Amino acid sequence: MIYNFDELIDRKNTSCVKYDALKKYFGYEDLQPLWVADMDFKTPDVIINAMKEKAEAGLFGYPIATEKTYNLVKSWMKKRHNWDIDTSWINFVNGVVPAYSATVEAFSEEGDEIIVQTPVYFPLFKHIKSNNRKLVKNPLIEENGYYRMDLEDLKSKISSKTKIFVLCSPHNPVGRVWDKEELEELAKICIENNILMISDEIHADIVFKKFIPLASISEEIANNTLTLNSPGKTFNTAGLNCAYAICKNENLMNRFKNVVEKRGISSVNVFGFVALEAAYEYSEDWLEELLVYLKNNILFTKNYLEKNNSKIDLIEPESTYLLWLSFKNTISDYNKVKQKLLEESKVALNEGSSFGLEGKGYFRLNCALPKESLEKALCKIVTKF
């Protein structure tokens, strides 16, 4: 490998949520953080150097996305996901979550229903409630460690008040990369019922099988989908607040833009565009090596649990660096599992129940860290369970 993902970097006291907010969120400071979805790997040097060059110029006025910026997003979608988009379909925003919240306002009214597939990344249902919409759950089905959509349940949940379906693709936290057939059937149901699809595809680059952007499947689906994405997860630049929406349907995009402007979320950090351009133009080789390292970490975790006859079950992911671990066969009392992880294993994981009640009994572990640190964490967990 050209890149050193084994490098141990001390992130404490660097004003990062993952390390410096442990006391606030978990009540303890002496925990190994395996929760927030960012990586313990350095951002590629080419991105760091581009930002240094920008910093050394000494000018930090209001930035703008140039023709190059738009074209790099377009070319990235083509070469990574075989998706042909037009630059006119792209609108930059300062984050996927703020943009998602804007879609809720733009395409529904107070009291309308929005469907999500739980367990799922919690802001996806949090912003439904904060916008005074009604959350409707279409829980995923888990069978023998594999999750699938329950489309019959989805059909039964649709009413005249249903306006939006939210797709998490790839899925956080269960790690599914949805197959084309699943997406087609899902889209068919939504289109037949005049339900707009919002597809959160922020983890699209961190995949271990072919990923299909929802809107790439057909023109009909593209005209009924607004996609949200960012280089933040891929290149560990989440703190630079640079994301974008992609939508072929001009009417939908204009409605989205109106709310984006109203909310003041169109201004991207001055370094955000710099990082995006360096990432999408020069950092693909880094990403390829990252994927190999992450896959090895996943396999290491699987083998470690098996070798130690652990009662913890890994839902092996098809995407993301987030491992969905079932503790259902360890201790029946969920609160005792949580307490034991904090007080005895001394690790900070995301509680499964925070992704919806369907996640109870599970915990999410971030494996985007050096193998040495991962092994240390697994040892602390397995010895107590």
Model segments located where?
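Conserved glycine-rich beta-strand-loop-beta hairpin in the small C-terminal domain of fold type I
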Residues: 277, 293-302, 314-327
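Conserved core of the PLP fold type I
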Residues: 60-188, 205-216, 220
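Walker B catalytic acidic pair
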Residues: 201
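PLP-dependent enzyme catalytic core of the Aspartate aminotransferase-like
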Residues: 155-156, 331, 340-349, 355-385
